[in-house]
Amino acid sequence: MGGLTINKLISIVVSVYNKEKFLDKCIQSIIDLNRDKSQLEAIFVDDVSTDNSYNILKKYADEYDFIRCIQLEENSGGPADPRNLGIQESKGKYITIVDADDWLEPNGYPNLINQMEEHGSDIGFGQAFKNRNKDIVKVANFASYKKANGLVPYEIYKIFRGMGPWGKIFKRSTTIDHNIKFRNLKFAEDKLFYAELISKSKSASMTDEHVYHVNRYSDNISLVKETDDIEKANFNIEVLKDLIKMDLPEYAKKQIISRIVEMDFISRVFIKKSFLKSNNKDVYYNMFEEVQNIIKEHGYDIEDFLENERYTNAFHAYQHSKEHFEEYIKFMLYNAHAHKYIKNNVVHFNYPDKFNYLPTLTSKCVAVHDGTHYMNETFYEVLHVYKKPNTTIEGVELVKINDESTRKTLKYEIHDNQIYLKTDDLHLDNYDFNIVIKFNDFEHSTVYASH
């Protein structure tokens, strides 16, 4: 255990650099955690802030015994070294990493820890929300859509699509036994750490309880925001080089590579207006060729990592020609929502003739309001659901507009692709709301008002 006495249940490690504006809220949320403070410690590691952050930390450390603050001798340039030092100094059985501008729910982590303790879990996942100026949105819903235990962490579907610290608790022993540390990178250091951590954890719990809030308000500047698309892509290439050589379960490795190919390159590099507007597209293409070469050198075919039909079609257009690829990206960004048709109760995308060599894209689930019906002396709102045969409806919710943290589960009946909701049930504390269909465990679709 690294020579330390493990006498706390949970250690909260927070790296800090010039976050004076946000620290009070972050620290207060830790103070407000519904847990005996003798069982937890909060370790704040300051990366030689040039504002008043360290003085704020010292004030809280003087006032609360469970709060510690450490300052590095010189600025390290990123969160990796402060986090590693915090983990090294921690005395908790479990650790969670918190960003200094974020905040926690009072009951979320305490309840998740109890759940992990009861079931002997190595890692736990709770629901996180990204707070932006105009809205609040769920983060990584695939890791926190229900209460469940006894899960194999790296087998949770899409788990590697969310490789940041938000909403995660893990055993300290996993990082020590496998020497898992954060790498000192300007971007993507989380991917390497959590990819290895999740892959080498043996058991997991998840909860749909709210645990973590991510600060993405416009007045919050981070290294991630300051890193442009090309620079991020180059960091992701370095991450791919490291990950593909790691000793990980083969299934986990393939899921991680799939995430890098689909999300970090096809989605976040190519399917963007900035790519179409670029006067130097060869830079983008050269990076993607390097990705393919890295994958090929290790005995894989990039098509083995394409799971989403949208991205698969993009890659096939890329193979056809760069001109077709750029036309396909333009279609997906500007025209895809305008060209649809219904066949066999499934919504299809109507491609231009130039893409007739590509399989037709279809939507898993689309729901449309079909009016108010009066039946058996009761008013019902009727929703028609267009869906693939293998799509399973899981539930119906009211979700506050622009705030996914506020929601209400509805009772419903479903017959022949029609969902029936009692009109009197459609209220959400006087908020304006959307009706949302939950399907295939964690996926969701907002109901359209009309065709």
Where are the language model's segments positioned?
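Short, charged low-complexity intrinsically disordered segments located at boundaries
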Residues: 88, 204, 225-228, 265-274, ...
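A broadly tuned preference for mixed-charge, low-complexity surface segments
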Residues: 174, 180-184, 255-264, 317-326
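P-loop NTPase catalytic cores that bind/hydrolyze ATP
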Residues: 240-241, 252-276
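Basic, ligand-binding patches in group-transfer machinery
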Residues: 275-451
